[in-house]
Structure formats: C-alpha cells, structure tokens
C-alpha cells in the first residue's frame, strides 16, 4: 500500500471521528443528525443528475442500506446522549470487524481462523476496559447497549453495501444514490423536530450540514482507496478512527479516563 493511499485512509478515519464529535457536542443531537443527513443529500442530488444509473439489481440494496442508516442515526444520537465520544465511538466502530466476520461465517459459510477469534476476544476485552468503572456501578449499561446497537447497524449496512456496490456496475453512482436517499432520513428527522428546525440559527444549520459533507467525504475517500489497495487492509487501517475519536474526546471535549480509554481503543484496533 502506497504512502498516499495510507494518508487518504487516515484522513478518512480522522474526518469520520470529526463528524461524530460534531454530533456529540450538539445540544439537540437528533436535529443535528437530521442536518448531517441533509448535508449528504445536497451533493448526492448533484451527482445522481450527472452520473449513470447503477444497475436495477443494486437499488434494493441502496434502499435497504438507507433503512439501516436510519436506525444507525437513531441509536447513535441516543448513545451520545448517554455516553462520552471516547467510549461510544470506539465500541461502535470497534465491534464492526468482529460482527462482519461472524456474518461471513453464519451467512456465507466462511471458516474463521484462530487468529480471527483472538481478535474478537481482544475487542471484547477492549469494550469491557473502556466501560469498566461504569459497568461496575451499573450506569454504563445503557451506553454500552446503544453503542453495541450502533455497531450492529454499521456491520449490517457494511454487508449490504458490500454486496450492492458489486452489483451496481458503478461505485460512484451507488455512493451518490446512497447519499441522495438520505433525503428520507433528513425528512423524517426534520418533521419530528420541525418546530426546532425553523428556530435554529444559521450557525447550527451550517455546522450540521458541514458534518454531512465531512461524513460523505470520509466515505468517498475510503471508496477511492479500495480501488488501489486490498479491501482487508483498507478496512483495518480505517478503524484507526477510534483512536482519533478518543484523542478528540480528551483534548477537545475534555473527557476523563483518557489513558484507559485510549488503551482500550488501541486494543480494539
């Protein structure tokens, strides 16, 4: 893997952690997530107007991915209401490789090597380490459950998009339609928070939509990198975002227990 591709993947990882930090710091996270979704619709609309259609077979996967993304947004917002960025994000992202491996075993009949089971075990240890004190007192169970649910959704839409993009015949078109269909997520969240939305200052609108643009850019960089490097290597390096999120949590959001949480994040990576 070339140095330029490594830099692109690390940039994507950092950007993903940044837009999650934007959501975490918002006063009304549901409203902000609606704006993040809207921020993906705008460039998506431009792209679908100039790119060829993906294959008809892939549209069911685009729609299914959109539905799972709605659940993902809902759980992510709730998780950040209850827990720190440096706890929620590493758990939600950290369990994805383990879950995808399990889906491959259960649905595709792949046999997991012993090293993969060791990796899954380390992820579990990392999750327990990041939440140890809270779990002992009982206050971290809600955060853990929501973070795990968020990670479950990520693993499902990753699997769906992995199949769908192969059927699409055009990676950019698949990506663009996925972004454009966030219109439904933005619409549902916007209707739910319609009174709040009309009263928001322009600064909040700008921050939320910027988060959407950052999110879409991060995903686009990963898609680009996958054209030039093995998928497994890209995915593994992509998970360095959990370290970026932990560092943002400590240096920017002033969250505590950063040494233990950073150690847990590194362990999960």
Where are these regions (language model features)?
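Alpha-helical transmembrane segments of multi-pass integral membrane proteins
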Residues: 121-122, 126, 143-161, 178-182, ...
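Membrane-interface interhelical linkers
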Residues: 1-67, 73-85, 132-146, 179-216, ...
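Hydrophobic/small/kink-forming positions within alpha-helical transmembrane segments
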Residues: 13-18, 45, 66, 70-74, ...
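Hydrophobic alpha-helical transmembrane segments in multi-pass integral membrane proteins
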Residues: 44-54, 100-116, 153-170, 214-232
């Amino acid at each position: 893997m070339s140095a330029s591709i490594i830099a692109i993947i690390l940039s994507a990882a950092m950007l993903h952690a940044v837009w999650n930090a934007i959501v975490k710091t918002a006063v009304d996270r549901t409203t902000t997530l609606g704006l993040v979704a809207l921020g993906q619709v705008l460039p998506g609309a431009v792209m679908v107007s100039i790119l060829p259609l993906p294959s008809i077979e892939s549209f069911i996967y685009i729609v299914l991915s959109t539905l799972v993304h709605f659940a993902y947004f809902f759980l992510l917002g709730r998780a950040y209401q209850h827990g720190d960025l440096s706890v929620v994000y590493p758990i939600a992202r950290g369990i994805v490789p383990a879950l995808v491996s399990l889906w491959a075993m259960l649905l595709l009949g792949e046999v997991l090597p012993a090293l993969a089971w060791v990796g899954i075990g380390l992820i579990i240890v990392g999750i327990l380490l990041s939440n140890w004190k809270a779990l002992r007192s009982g206050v971290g169970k809600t955060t853990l459950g929501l973070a795990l649910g968020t990670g479950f959704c990520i693993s499902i839409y990753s699997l769906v998009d992995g199949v769908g993009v192969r059927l699409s015949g055009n990676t950019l078109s698949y990506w663009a339609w996925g972004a454009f269909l966030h219109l439904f997520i933005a619409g549902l969240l916007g209707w739910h928070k319609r009174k709040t939305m009309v009263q928001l200052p322009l600064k909040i609108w700008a921050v939320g939509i910027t988060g959407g643009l950052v999110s879409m850019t991060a995903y686009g960089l990963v898609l680009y990198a996958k054209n030039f490097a093995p998928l497994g290597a890209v995915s593994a390096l992509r998970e360095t975002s959990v370290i970026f999120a932990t560092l943002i949590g400590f240096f920017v959001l002033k969250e505590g227990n950063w040494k233990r949480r950073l150690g847990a994040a590194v362990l999960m990576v």
